[in-house]
Structure formats: structure tokens, C-alpha cells
Amino acid sequence: MMNIILIGARGAGKSKVSRSLSKQSEIPVVSTDSVAVYETGGIPIPKFVENNGWKAFRELEYSILQKLQNANGIILDCGGGILFDLDESGNEVLSERKLDLLRKIGRIVYLERGIEELVEKVKGDKTRPDLSKITTYRSILEKRLPVYQEAAHFKLNLTKLSKEEAAEKILDWIGIKSKSI
């Protein structure tokens, strides 16, 4: 069975859509962020990044994707930075190695929202690591959004869709019948 991979910016709705997809298809969800917390012995991601830096976190994501490359029949809910690594200067760059693994793992679905909508959604969310130390979230989005678009096999704009409608569209695209109808 094919794996479904959800990518998109922080606050796009990947976790909500992945849960709805799972409910409709009975395919289990694996979250790269949840696996990262598990792999670090329960350390929340913001704390891990604070202690070890973003580069170490991006390495951890890569090792998680390596472990998942033979997965079969999962919905992979990816953290917002999954497509990126840091260069020598600490700038975000496309991670060819992670994108290659994601393409091996399954079909990549980009869940899209507008920049303003995303900025509003994540303002003051204490459960997420602070991105402002790198640069403003808006400028991060301006760099990341074209990369998500380029990486995806399928793009879905969530602005006017409920999570259930989004899940139905993804299942239709993949050719899996929804179990909740």
C-alpha cells in the first residue's frame, strides 16, 4: 500500500488533516515531530532546539526518514521544516537528501495556505520552537512556500476546505475509497 506524505508550513493544518485522513481511510498516522520527541527521550522540540540547535534537529529528522523508508501503508505528517537543512552559514537550504527519501517513502501532498493566514495561526504559539531567532516567520515562508510547491506530487489549498473535505480530496487523488461514507 502507498504512503501519503503531508508537507506544508507550520500552522497549515497537516496534523488535523492527517487525523481526518486516518479516520476516513483507517491508515495510521506517523508524525515526524512525535517520533523526534520519542527519539530524544521525551524532550520537547523547542527544548531540543534550544539545547542542540536547528542543525542537530534537521539531522534527527533525516535519521527518522531513513528509518521510515521501508514503511508501508502510513500517513506521514511532516514537521514544517522537513524539506530543509542548514548550510555552513546556518541558512536554510533545500535538503536534497530528505526530499529524495520522502519521494522514496510515498506520494507528497503539499497543504497550502496564504502567508498572512499562516502568520496569524502561529503567532504566540508556545508549543512550537521559536523561529524568530533565525528571521521573521513571514520571510521564512517566502523562502519555503515555493520549495513545498516544487517538492509535491499534489497540491491542495486549504483556505476554503474543512479538514474532512481536504482528506476526501487527497483520498480521491490517491484512489482510496473513504471508509467514513
Curated annotation (Swiss-Prot):
Entry EC no(s): 2.7.1.71
InterPro entries: P-loop_NTPase, Shikimate/glucono_kinase, Shikimate_kinase/TSH1
Alphabetized SUPFAM superfamilies for the sequence: P-loop containing nucleoside triphosphate hydrolases (SSF52540)
Binding site for Mg(2+): 15
Gene3D superfamilies: P-loop containing nucleotide triphosphate hydrolases
Pfam families to which the protein is assigned, alphabetical: SKI (PF01202)
Record note on cofactor: Binds 1 Mg(2+) ion per subunit.
Binding locations of substrate: 33, 58, 80, 144
Subcellular location: Cytoplasm
Cofactor: Mg(2+)
Function according to Swiss-Prot or TrEMBL: Catalyzes the specific phosphorylation of the 3-hydroxyl group of shikimic acid using ATP as a cosubstrate.
Protein name per its UniProtKB record: Shikimate kinase
Species whose genome carries this gene: Leptospira biflexa serovar Patoc (strain Patoc 1 / ATCC 23582 / Paris)
